[in-house]
UniProtKB/Swiss-Prot annotation:
The RecF protein is involved in DNA metabolism; it is required for DNA replication and normal SOS inducibility. RecF binds preferentially to single-stranded, linear DNA. It also seems to bind ATP. HAMAP family: RecF. This is DNA replication and repair protein RecF. Coiled coil: none annotated. InterPro entries: DNA-binding_RecF (IPR001238), DNA-binding_RecF_CS (IPR018078), P-loop_NTPase (IPR027417), RecF/RecN/SMC_N (IPR003395), RecF_2 (IPR042174). GO terms for biological process: DNA replication; DNA synthesis involved in DNA repair; double-strand break repair; SOS response.
């Protein structure tokens, strides 16, 4: 999977810009604040329905503009040896949005997100390891969403049951009114948890060698999973029943996969809380690379890899290891930096360079 064309209108500093990246390594340079991150941000919005720097209405739309527009054309695998071209467009005002995919209107942002797969590493990615459980649950669900066609329906089934149960709890509904939603929550939640656990076990097999290759000093050895209730002791149905009175008092559901979490284990460290910010970033990057490799194995093609501000996030040795691993894979990689990162100094003809300045994006040569 690789982007052939990215068109951006009225996004941050850009009034209108066209980007035609190579299918291999791409480097976007520019001063801080020039807008190079916004190129990756536009791609991320199309693939996730949100920016990695906040909501669309919080400064993403260019000052004076009413909305932003993003258009992406990409090539993806269509069979054993064939490719097809796909196109998607999104217009977003911060309050309302319209989207098109392959010439057809889409009713849900999920349709766009399911079509285009982008793995993003950016300065805030360390929260995947050092933050709360929500980004880690999203991480698992993204991987499942893109490799298991029926996962989204399962996730929505659980989310709907959870919303209905919580609404009844807040209303102080009688216990018997919870029975139907408890059954739905337990049935979908058990299946959701099994899928997550299977995915995490598969991911662990890829993560350990990835972490060893790019950051051997971490000693990352395994992943642990907390399903969101005492699954080894009781079923989710029983856990919901046992917690029912407490949930009625508190007004929310305290047991289930919406409270699940996972964590990395390290040979030489007591746990993720002992990690420095730099170590948390490296661990997060290893997890993202492992997820991308799993996607490639399951789908037969790599997702698009977007690495923002790589030079300031990793030292030259870790940069070199990461780039070497990505360059050895048939992945399209988009990297931003203020200048040529040392890890890319030997990339040669596989690297296409661009410069961002004054709201413009132009191809450059190594001598520029």
């Amino acid at each position: 999977m690789h982007v052939a064309r990215l068109s951006i209108h009225r996004l941050r500093r850009f009034e209108a810009v066209e980007f035609h990246p190579a299918s291999t390594l791409n480097l976007l340079t520019g001063d801080n604040g020039a807008g190079k991150t916004s190129v990756l941000e536009a791609l991320h919005v199309m693939a996730y329905g949100r920016s990695f720097r906040g909501r669309v209405r919080d400064g993403l739309i260019r000052q004076g503009g009413q909305d932003l527009e993003i258009f992406v054309e990409w090539r993806e695998r269509a069979g054993d040896s064939t490719e097809r071209t796909r196109r998607a467009g999104l217009r977003h005002s911060g309050q309302e949005w319209t989207g098109r995919l392959d010439g057809e209107d889409v009713a849900q942002l999920g349709s766009l997100c399911a079509a285009l797969a982008v793995v993003t590493f950016e300065p805030g990615s360390h929260v995947l390891i050092s933050g709360g459980g929500e980004p880690r649950r999203r991480f698992l669900d993204w991987g499942l969403f893109h490799v298991e066609p029926d996962f989204l329906a399962l996730w929505r089934r659980y989310a709907r049951a959870l919303k209905q149960r919580n609404a009844l709890l807040k209303q102080g509904a009688q216990p018997q009114m919870l029975d139907a939603w408890d059954h739905e929550l337990a049935e979908s939640g058990e299946t959701l948890t099994s899928r997550r656990l299977q995915y995490l076990e598969r991911l662990q097999e890829r993560l350990v060698p990835v972490a060893t290759a790019i950051a051997p000093s971490l000693g990352l050895s395994a992943l642990t999973f907390a399903p969101g209730w005492r699954r080894h002791e009781v079923s989710l149905a029983d856990a919901l029943l046992l917690a029912r009175e407490r949930d009625r008092q508190n007004g929310y559901t305290s047991q289930g996969p919406h409270r699940a979490d996972w964590a990395p284990l390290f040979d030489a460290l007591p746990g993720k809380d002992a990690l420095s910010r730099g170590q948390a970033k490296l661990t997060a990057l290893a997890c993202l690379l492992a997820q991308a490799e799993d996607f490639a194995h399951e789908r037969g093609e790599w997702p698009i890899m977007a690495l923002d501000d790589l030079g300031s996030e990793l030292d030259r040795h870790h940069q070199a290891r990461v780039i070497q691993r990505l360059a050895s894979a048939p992945a399209q990689v988009l990297i931003t930096a203020t200048e040529l990162p040392p890890g890319l100094a030997d990339a040669g003809k596989t690297l296409r360079r661009f410069h961002v300045e004054h709201g413009q994006l132009v191809p450059t040569t190594a001598a520029d």
